[in-house]
A protein has these predicted regions:
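Structured interaction and signal-relay segments at domain junctions
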Residues: 3-10, 18-96
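Short, flexible beta-strand-to-coil junctions
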Residues: 35-39, 107-108, 118-121
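Helix-to-coil/beta transition segments that act as allosteric "coupling" elements at the rims
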Residues: 87-111
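Juxtadomain coupling helices with adjacent low-complexity linkers
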Residues: 1-16, 120-167
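Short glycine-/small-residue motifs
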Residues: 113-116
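Glycine-rich loops and low-complexity Gly/Arg-rich segments
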Residues: 56-61, 69-71, 102-106, 127-130, ...
Length: 167
């Protein structure tokens, strides 16, 4: 799937970086917000547009760790190191120097939200921070949705559609 560099999901990365500024104190440098609807439409916002662009162009959503049908997920936190498709985790690390991540997953009736937090390869101890501060991460998710509500509303008007995989 090819998106124009002007598509909001790619052009909003600077705005996303501003929204995650409070995370800088913890050296969290990577954040994504994905909202996957049961009808197959999706929102994908990220601080790293080059990663999202490559992910879509390579059609990695066909095997992605958060790209199965939204009904298959539970409300939970999941470390990148525990995800089923480690090939994508390694690709993110090797090609974009992003690792040591965690997903906060929130399920509702018509969609599932995925908030990912990550950092660079030189910060493996961040995983301890995640595990000991899940409440902080949950509060940041709420903060992001409130502070980014206008961005999310704009994204709602440009949702992508692609098939969910069944793995």
């Amino acid at each position: 799937m090819i998106l124009s560099d002007k598509h909001l999901f790619l052009s909003a990365s600077t705005e996303m970086q501003e929204l995650i500024r409070p995370l800088a104190v913890h050296n969290i440098t990577y954040f994504t917000y994905n909202k996957n609807y049961i009808d197959g439409t999706r929102i994908r916002l990220t601080t790293h547009a080059t990663h999202l662009k490559a992910f879509l162009e390579n059609e990695y959503y066909r095997t992605g760790n958060i790209d199965a049908h939204p009904e298959l997920y539970l409300n939970q936190a999941a470390l990148f190191s525990t995800l089923k498709n480690q090939t994508l985790v390694e690709w993110l690390k090797n090609d974009f120097q992003v690792e040591n991540g965690i997903y906060i997953i929130r399920k509702s009736e018509t969609y599932t939200e995925f908030f990912s937090f990550a950092t660079g390869p030189s910060n493996p101890q961040i995983v301890n921070f995640y595990l000991n501060n899940l409440d902080y991460l949950q509060k940041f998710c709420d903060y992001f949705k409130e502070q980014g509500k206008d961005l999310i509303a704009r994204a709602e008007k440009q949702k992508l559609i692609h098939v969910y995989h069944h793995d």
